[in-house]
Amino acid sequence: MPAKYWLLPLFALAVLAFSAHGPARADTQQFAVIYVEFLPAKQDRGEELVEQLAALGRRNGAVSFTANEEIQRPNFFVLLAIWNNAAARQTFDSLPQTQALLARITALLEAPLDLRLGTLIE
């Protein structure tokens, strides 16, 4: 097929694709996914601590904060937190209670925490 038939529609699609999304806004909902792997001998205590962290998050402005245990690996958890904006998440991260719980969790880990942040897209 000659280029004259597909070049103009392709160009139009490219313009639409690159102009559809503006820069990320600070007031959009943010999420954090944290993968936590405890030492097998410490998984019960670790589970208590991640549940405390999730409860603390819910009390301090999280839209949602869950701690989910992997079925096949009972020492592996995925924490999912949703915040109204980046400032709310950063405020929670800087709380002394949050820092204390994270320090206690870190002492029980098999591997470092794997934190992934992002912006929710509607």
Residue ranges and their predicted role:
Residues 1-11:
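Bacterial N-terminal signal peptides that target proteins for export
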Residues 5-6, 17-31, 36, 63-73, ...:
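Glycine-rich beta-strand-turn "strand-cap" elements at beta-sheet edges
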Residues 37-48:
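Short, surface-exposed ligand-recognition loops at beta-strand->loop->(often short) alpha-helix junctions
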Residues 41-42, 71-73, 83-88, 98, ...:
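Solvent-exposed loop/turn segments at secondary-structure junctions
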Residues 52-64, 82-116:
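An amphipathic, aromatic/His-enriched active-site/gating alpha helix that lines ligand/cofactor pockets
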Residues 76:
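Short glycine-/small-residue motifs
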